[in-house]
């Protein structure tokens, strides 16, 4: 039995010396150490040995098994290292070749339009003011002369956090905060995100950008409002653009108006976009309501002012001819790469 074990050991050593691959190593392991391997068969037959022979043969068998296992392990490591060396030699890198460029992003059309609008108003002497997106009812509705029973206060239009807190539905609250904290003269714009309880479709989104403006000083008239907005329209869309004002109603301005501009698709000749009228609604505006001034501790007998507001998303869509607002929020590089 001991002689047989020595023969198995020597046979395994000779085979391992000529082994060149992992598959060959695995075949040798199975031949000698597998369930039906030669060494395994001997170990299973030890029950037939005498009590004196059993520990002696068992010791030799375990030594042979350990030796074969260790030799296979070392051979496997050697083959692995050789394969790695060959792979590294074949995978040489030409460091003189140019690397792959990272994809370059594009500025979002909303960002481009917001920046253009800000630059125009800053050049006209306006400052930029900011405020919280989670707003008190007082600033979002009450101080703006919007009564408790106004439809805009309904849950179908407004996201309520609790009875006293809402996600701002407009950036007008920033105007109120500015009038509370600053003394006239005031000349500011308030760009930012606003929230409405709208279903998503081609022209509506529950989140969009708005920019509102406010001027308060002594002797401010509707002519000042008209001149400011006409100048903005020409700088934004070119000198050929025409504008007109239509009477309207807003709780926080009196008198109120909406300003239309010649259609950017048909240049005022009439098309599907402007529904054949040649005009597109651009923004809402008006003279600040006396009660709004009083709510901010500004005497309407001494000061007057005008306010205006427009959806930035709408401006983007008109400027670039985009017909679906959802494109502005989908982060689709095929769309964004066009700007």
UniProtKB/Swiss-Prot annotation:
Keywords, sorted A to Z: Aminoacyl-tRNA synthetase, ATP-binding, Cytoplasm, Ligase, Magnesium, Metal-binding, Nucleotide-binding, Protein biosynthesis
Which cofactors, by name? Mg(2+)
Provide the protein's localization.
Cytoplasm
Q: Which residues bind Mg(2+)?
A: 254
Catalytic activity of the protein: tRNA(Phe) + L-phenylalanine + ATP = L-phenylalanyl-tRNA(Phe) + AMP + diphosphate + H(+)
Provide the E.C. number(s) assigned to this enzyme: 6.1.1.20
Could you say which enzyme class this protein belongs to?
Answer: ligase
Sorted alphabetically, which Gene3D superfamilies does this protein's record hold? Bira Bifunctional Protein, Domain 2
Free-text comment on the cofactor: Binds 2 magnesium ions per tetramer.
Coarse class of the primary localization is: cytoplasm
Q: Does the keyword Protein biosynthesis apply?
A: yes
The cross-references to InterPro entries, in alphabetical order and at most eight, read: aa-tRNA-synth_II, aa-tRNA-synth_II/BPL/LPL, Phe-tRNA-synth_IIc_asu, Phe-tRNA_ligase_II_N, Phe_tRNA_ligase_alpha1_bac, Phenylalanyl-tRNA_Synthase, tRNA-bd_arm
* GO CC terms: cytoplasm
Q: Biological process GO annotation list?
A: phenylalanyl-tRNA aminoacylation
Family per UniProt?
Belongs to the class-II aminoacyl-tRNA synthetase family. Phe-tRNA synthetase alpha subunit type 1 subfamily.
Q: What HAMAP family does its record include?
A: Phe_tRNA_synth_alpha1
Q: Which NCBIfam families match?
A: pheS (TIGR00468)
**Subunit:** Tetramer of two alpha and two beta subunits.
Q: What is the recorded name of this protein?
A: Phenylalanine--tRNA ligase alpha subunit
Native species: Clostridium botulinum (strain Langeland / NCTC 10281 / Type F)
């Amino acid at each position: 039995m001991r002689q047989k074990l020595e023969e198995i050991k020597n046979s395994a050593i000779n085979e391992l010396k000529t082994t060149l691959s992992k598959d060959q190593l695995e075949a040798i392991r199975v031949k000698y150490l597998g369930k039906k391997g030669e060494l395994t068969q001997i170990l299973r037959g030890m029950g037939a040995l005498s009590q004196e022979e059993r520990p002696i043969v068992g010791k030799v068998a375990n030594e042979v098994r350990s030796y074969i296992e260790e030799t296979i392990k070392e051979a496997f490591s050697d083959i692995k290292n050789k394969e790695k060396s060959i792979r590294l030699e074949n995978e040489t890198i030409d460091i003189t070749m140019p690397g792959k460029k990272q994809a370059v992003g594009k500025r979002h059309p909303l960002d481009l339009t917001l920046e253009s609008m800000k630059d125009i108003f800053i050049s006209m002497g306006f400052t930029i003011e900011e405020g919280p997106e989670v707003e008190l009812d007082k600033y979002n509705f009450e101080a703006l002369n919007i009564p408790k029973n106004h439809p805009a206060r309904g849950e179908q239009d407004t996201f309520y956090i609790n009875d006293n807190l809402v996600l701002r539905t407009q950036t007008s609250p920033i105007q109120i905060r500015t009038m509370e904290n600053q003394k006239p003269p005031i000349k500011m714009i308030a760009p930012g995100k606003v929230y409405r309880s709208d279903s998503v479709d081609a022209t509506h989104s529950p989140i969009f950008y708005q920019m509102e403006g406010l001027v308060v000083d002594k002797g401010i008239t509707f002519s000042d409002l008209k001149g400011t907005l006409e100048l903005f329209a020409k700088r934004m869309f070119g000198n050929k653009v025409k504008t007109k004002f239509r009477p309207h109603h807003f709780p926080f301005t009196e008198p109120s108006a909406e300003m239309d501009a010649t259609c950017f698709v048909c240049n005022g000749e009439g098309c599907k976009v402007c529904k054949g009228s040649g005009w597109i609604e651009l923004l809402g505006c008006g003279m600040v309501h006396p009660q709004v001034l009083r709510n901010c501790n500004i005497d309407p007998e001494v000061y007057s002012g005008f306010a205006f507001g427009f959806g930035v998303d709408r401006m983007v869509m008109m400027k670039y001819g985009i017909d679906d607002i959802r494109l502005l929020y989908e982060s689709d590089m095929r769309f964004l790469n066009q700007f």
